[in-house]
């Protein structure tokens, strides 16, 4: 590292001394970052933030004295800064984490498994990557509205859109979406305006097992389309969005005239499973001109090559613009590779998608 480069200063907040020690060890082992201080609870953290002015905060979601969400909400209102949440692999933990992302947290990691060395190298790399991305992220000062308020605003009020069971119903047009850091909120903003009869949406969001089901359930309460975690072999239907499970790649397949969701436990691609590239490439192969590709905020380059393949197969492609991205990594790579037809702000993405679909009319290409 160049001597003039400053290390990323990280403040770790966790009520477990063991977790604080382990996080400190991992972060301090990286050449470009260091733990400037640790805190056992948000009240201590508040004073340490004033003292050390950290670049990134890692924050446990559940702590004594002050709840992690309460602290995050106050922090993002009074002193917005990049926050990476540290969450347990429980249903409650995943729900709290998703709420934290709504409030403005940049990303999250699961808690390290104390005493288990297997997988620790991979965990260390992921934590370091997320801290680096957070240090460069655009932090939103104004948090998103609560889920209930957002649902009411979209006229859904938590009711799931009805499932379509008619065996003659098919979906020819498809919306294929990939995202990483900042993607949970970006996906919410893309999906909530879609009408109940929108084409099917397939989504690969970098997220660990245990979180995607809660993510899908949360979106299902906000959207006019049905949102669910994808299941292997199920038909892909209009008015539905299918989110790749955190443990598997999601691919588009065909069975006669129908599109089918296919799950694969093949090794990670671009260090991710689910991988955006895997989903995009399957869409290029099986949907061709019938698909729209959308790459949203995220670090790294996953999805860039696959989006180019979609474009070469005739799909129209979108990328989120830099100003509205939390991290402009994946869209930047896709644009640089020449795989993007239209660069759009997040606030206008759904409108542009629906306008493009309308321009396609009924001229569906058979593949």
From Swiss-Prot:
Enzyme class label: hydrolase
The reaction(s) this protein catalyses: [protein]-L-glutamate 5-O-methyl ester + H2O = L-glutamyl-[protein] + methanol + H(+); L-glutaminyl-[protein] + H2O = L-glutamyl-[protein] + NH4(+)
Residue ranges of domain Response regulatory in the record: 9-126
PROSITE patterns noted in UniProt: CHEB, RESPONSE_REGULATORY
Entry GO terms, CC: cytoplasm
A Gene Ontology molecular function term of the record: phosphorelay response regulator activity
CDD domains reported in the protein's UniProt record: CheB_Rec, REC_CheB-like
Intracellular or extracellular location(s): Cytoplasm
Sites bearing 4-aspartylphosphate, chain numbering: 60
Active site residues according to the UniProt entry: 180, 206, 302
Highest taxon above the source species: Bacteria
Domain CheB-type methylesterase: 168-360
Family: Belongs to the CheB family.
NCBIfam families: PRK00742.1 (NF001965), PRK12555.1 (NF009206)
This protein's name: Protein-glutamate methylesterase/protein-glutamine glutaminase 1
Organism: Burkholderia pseudomallei (strain K96243)
């Amino acid at each position: 590292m160049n001597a003039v480069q400053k290390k990323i200063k990280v403040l770790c907040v966790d009520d477990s001394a063991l977790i604080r020690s382990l996080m400190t060890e991992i972060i301090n082992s990286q050449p470009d970052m260091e733990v400037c201080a640790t805190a056992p609870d948000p009240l201590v953290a508040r004073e340490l933030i004033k003292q050390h002015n950290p670049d990134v905060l890692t924050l446990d979601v559940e702590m004594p004295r002050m709840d992690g969400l309460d602290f995050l909400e106050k922090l993002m209102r009074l002193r917005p800064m990049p926050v990476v949440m540290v969450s347990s692999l429980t249903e409650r933990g995943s729900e709290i984490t998703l709420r934290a992302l709504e409030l403005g947290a940049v990303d999250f990691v699961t808690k390290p498994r104390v005493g288990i060395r297997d997988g620790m190298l991979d965990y260390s790399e992921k934590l370091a990557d997320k801290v680096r991305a957070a240090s460069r992220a655009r932090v939103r000062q104004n948090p998103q509205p609560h889920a209930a308020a957002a649902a009411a605003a979209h006229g859904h009020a938590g009711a799931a859109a009805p499932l379509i069971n008619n065996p003659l119903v098919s979906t020819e047009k498809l919306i294929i979406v990939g995202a990483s850091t900042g993607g949970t909120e970006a996906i919410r903003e893309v999906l909530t305006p879609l009408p109940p009869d929108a084409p099917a949406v397939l989504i690969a969001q970098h997220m660990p097992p245990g979180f995607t089901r809660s993510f899908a359930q949360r979106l299902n309460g906000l959207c006019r389309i049905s949102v669910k975690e994808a299941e292997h072999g199920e038909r892909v239907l209009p008015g539905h969005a299918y989110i790749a499970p955190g443990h598997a790649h999601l691919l588009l397949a065909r069975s006669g005239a129908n599109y089918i969701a296919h799950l694969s436990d093949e090794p990670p691609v671009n260090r991710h499973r689910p991988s955006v590239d895997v989903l995009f490439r399957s869409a290029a192969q099986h949907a061709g001109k019938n698909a729209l590709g959308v790459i949203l905020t995220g670090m790294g380059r996953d999805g860039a090559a696959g989006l180019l393949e979609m474009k070469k197969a005739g799909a129209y492609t979108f990328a989120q613009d830099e100003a509205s991205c939390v991290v402009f990594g994946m869209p930047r790579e896709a644009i640089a590779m020449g795989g993007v037809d239209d660069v759009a702000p997040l606030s206008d993405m759904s409108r542009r998608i629906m306008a493009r679909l309308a321009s396609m009319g009924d001229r569906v290409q058979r593949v």
